[in-house]
Amino acid sequence: MKFLSLLLLVGVAQAIVPPREPRPPTGGGKKLLTYKECVPRATLAPRSTSLAWINSDEDGQYISQSDDGALILQNIVTNTNKTLVAADKVPKGFYDYWIKPDLTAVLWATNYTKQYRHSYFANYFILDIEKGSLTPLAEDQSGDIQYAQWNPVDNSIAYVRGNDLYVWNSGKTKRITENGGPDTFNGVPDWVYEEEIFGDRFALWFSPDGEYLAYLRFNETGVPTYTVPYYKNKQKIAPAYPRELEIRYPKVSAKNPTVQFHLLNLASSEETSIPVTAFPEDDLIIGEVAWLSSGHDSVAFRAFNRVQDTEKIVNVKVGSKESKVIRERDGTDGWIDNLLSMSYIGKVNGKEYYVDISDASGWAHLYLYPVDGGKEIALTKGEWEVTAILKVDTKSKLIYFTSTKFHSTTRHVYSVSYDTKVMTPLVNDREAAYYSASFSAKGGYYILSYQGPNVPYQELYSVKDKKKPIKTITSNDALIEKLKDYKLPKITFFEIKLPSGESLNVMQRLPPNFNPFKKYPVLFTPYGGPGAQEVSQAWKALDFKAYITSDPELEYVTWTVDNRGTGFKGRKFRSTVTKRLGFLEPQDQVFAAKEILKNRWADKDHVGMWGWSYGGFLTAKTMETDSGVFTFGMSTAPVSDFRLYDSMYTERYMKTVELNADGYSETAVHKTDGFKNLKGHYLIQHGTGDDNVHFQNSAVLSNTLMNGGVTPDRLTTQWFTDSDHGVRYDNDSTFQYKQLTKMVYDQKQPRPQTTPLHQWSKRVLAALFGEEAEE
């Protein structure tokens, strides 16, 4: 909501003309992409518009922000707009805002300070729209409030400060908990729950009628601490002693934070702890909380065992505070993903249901489940997957969702009636494309976002007329005009079949002036992690990968291959990597490399790989195979040993060390012959301030390679002082991409037939090549 455009509902409804062709753009001009246009971020990029739909009595209202900063209330039905908050009432430098449901107040976040990937600290202020007065949420706040949220019904706000829960109501604040501190979190997740379970910064949920609040309490007592040093700490002159950030970070088989489920009666402030007996305390993860009623009768939570291959849905009856398991599943053939997809439906044929996504059939599909337990009702089926629930419209008895029905690399928007089970596409689902949609509060309108493979656009529709848009929200016509001057890399998508029968999705970029009679170096660019997807029909940024394909001095062909274990091709395809990360994935990349080398234009002497995070790990494991196919590699922020990574991610796929000791030993990068035998070079890059994949991984990897005899002409390790997992501190990203570019340039050059001998290298060369060493 931080970057909103003013949308004026004027003029005649217009669709995108001409329609986008179902392929990535190639340009049509003569200009080639330059380094400055692509690195470190793409400057030739599509824009998108975010809308804040308003949940009011009248559907089709949303908030946008004008050029002068004012908040504008737009009404699709009446084709009007009005100023809700004048520009001079908007706090300077605000980070985010939330409109009170009755449109009488705005909650502003200011003085933003980033914490982890999703979380931040801020000051919060309440603007009374009618009076124009601005009131601090807490009088003594000092940029230390962790989270705040409006009650969906009344004038109250739940917020978290110092890991304690508070409720503000019409100017009066009540402290709900008093045990918050460094090891106890109320209503907000700790690091590992934020990063690996919720993917968000809150752990509290108002009931639909606003009368109750469900929240989680996390206790990190006994969870080991990892210390991240900050050598510069954003100071001009480095402090003599680095600042040390201590994070409770559970690694594999270490103690996890414990979690408790609580209910708060907002009228009486009565707080109740609900016993969780689904799993023992030290074997419990709560992955999702959802209200299963239109009021506050029932609330459910999704419980997993520690290694996330067993799931139990627990329903709590708020009145009696009694709970029972209403659904459970054994997923020990792999793991069970936490899709955060439970949503209350209401009564169907006299029985209350909720909708959820499950891949128990082997493919992720929509099911209705009885709130009180019982047999599910399948709403979708087939060898394709539902990827997200977009909206539940209980009035029309429709569920809107995205799926891979056309192909695993595509996304199309559909509705399914939970009354008739009839499935209807909202878009042309017979061509390769990638769509999503954002629905108004009551489901009468939606913004359809075409996200690729061609230049993205957004259109506004009524659900009553899915063929003709009300208007185009974002056309990106200016970008299309600019791209007409360019000759862009040619992107194609295809599949290659493994000897075992599975097919792998591949995305190929060819240089703009590709000549099949020339030789071209090749760079593989995988991510390859469990359940992930890189090869999709979504828009491909004109970034570093596009640049190295375009530059006449480089002209790399790039291949991105989604190996076994990646997502959206069914449970069996995903689960095959269980307990053996880094085993099948490099085999698939090597197989793909052998396939590309069947092309006469592929230069077998210059085949590299670059990956980030899991992709960096996969790059290292692929070099480790000593296949003779890859000649160089580049790993950015790699995991090198999953015993060094967090428990909730790793154990989902690898289980615990006690259950899989040999698997962990094999998963770690530990063999060095493949690195020693590279014709080219191996580069490691890592930020020392990485709180996710710790710098420890690259430190250990470098040590392993050096002790294993990898020579300086084969290995470079580059650290980035205080940079996090995204390498964003100071000018680090600029240096990083210059280094990567120099690497791919150097690695495509002809290699000398003989290596010069020096006093410092004779013994090493003798060991490598069997030559007699001189004393």
Swiss-Prot record:
Signal peptide: 1-15
EC code: 3.4.14.5
Organism: Arthroderma otae (strain ATCC MYA-4605 / CBS 113480)
Active-site residues from the entry: S613, D690, H725
Protein's recorded name: Dipeptidyl peptidase 4
Superkingdom: Eukaryota
Entry's localization field: Secreted
EC category: hydrolase
Glycosylation sites noted in the Swiss-Prot or TrEMBL record: N81, N111, N219, N731
